Amino acid sequence: MIRGALAAWRRRVRRPRRAAAPRALILLYHRIGEPGVDPWGLTVTPARLAQHLDALRRSRRVVPLHELLERLRRGEGRLAAVTFDDGYSDALTQAAPRLADAGVPATVFVTTGALDRPAEHWWDTLAHLVFAGALPATCDLELAGRPFRMSLEAGASGDHAEATDGPWRAWEPPPGPREALYRALYDLLLPLRELERRRALDALHAWAGVAQAIRASHRLLTAAELRDLARRDHIEIGAHTVTHPWLAAQSVADQAAEIAGSRQAIERVIERPVTAFAYPYGRTEHYTRQTVRLVRRAGFALACANVPGPVDAGTDPFQLPRLQVQNWGVEEFAARLLNLT
């Protein structure tokens, strides 16, 4: 019996197997700078980015995002594409030079609502407000038309800027009152429309006694900077809505305006067609089938999500998976790529 089983196993091993379909991966970066307070792990240092790009180009052929699916259909393998979300100004000052040095093309997805004024994304503003400096012992406010009350207990005093510059991330259970406050406020603000969110943040700044200021480290691209970035040979610009809303929580009309409006705004600035889109936040709960239809209707050729997974020739071009890269050392970075494909 044992000999028969061994012989059968040998026959299976020797039997020619159909070659696996070529697969690729798409990397997703956000900020390039020093992490500081970074509850969502969005920041990769410039040095780490350079290491990642070097490791990536040594192991795969990095191609422009818009070429990826067609190359897979032709049977090309070991491909990768690089993307950056949210339109941080460091895409121009930090990422672009390192991409050029490595000879790596990339797509930068830009939110357009702040192209004409200095601005930060709301989650960065919230983290700075919650973790930098002393706070009142109780947060007791009306936010977005509903009462919000939370006690900070012993966590109200002192500077907690290091609380999230370490093991805690916002998807983990909060270890203290500041982290709990941040997550509760984040969840409250996430589904709001932009005007409601601004009013809520104004109320929170007044409660905390924190002056509203746009930090150079978190500032978004201006129109002039976007135009400069788009001139780089290795950079493609994609759309990422106007105000970075949770699209699934918005009306169909508001979704359509956010999707098409961002494309139109970018095209006015860079004077060339925009064919790629990325869903804000990008998990499956953040957009719907209707959202995908609206993206198609707006004239885009592809759209990216924020769900890890490989890409093959049969992948839906309007739900392309991406691996969100964190500030990993080069060995962990390489291991993550290997595990994905």
Regions found by a protein language model. Give the residues of each.
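Short acidic, Gly/Ser-rich segments with clustered Asp/Glu that frequently serve as metal-coordination loops
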Residues: D86-T93, R98
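C-terminal active-site subregion of NodB/CE4 polysaccharide deacetylases
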Residues: M1-T83, D90, P118-L129, L135-T138, ...
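Short amphipathic alpha-helical segments and helix-helix/interface helices
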Residues: A50-L53, A96, L201, A223-R227, ...
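Metal-dependent polysaccharide deacetylase catalytic core of the NodB/CE4 family, i.e.
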Residues: L27, I32-G33, A100-E285, L320
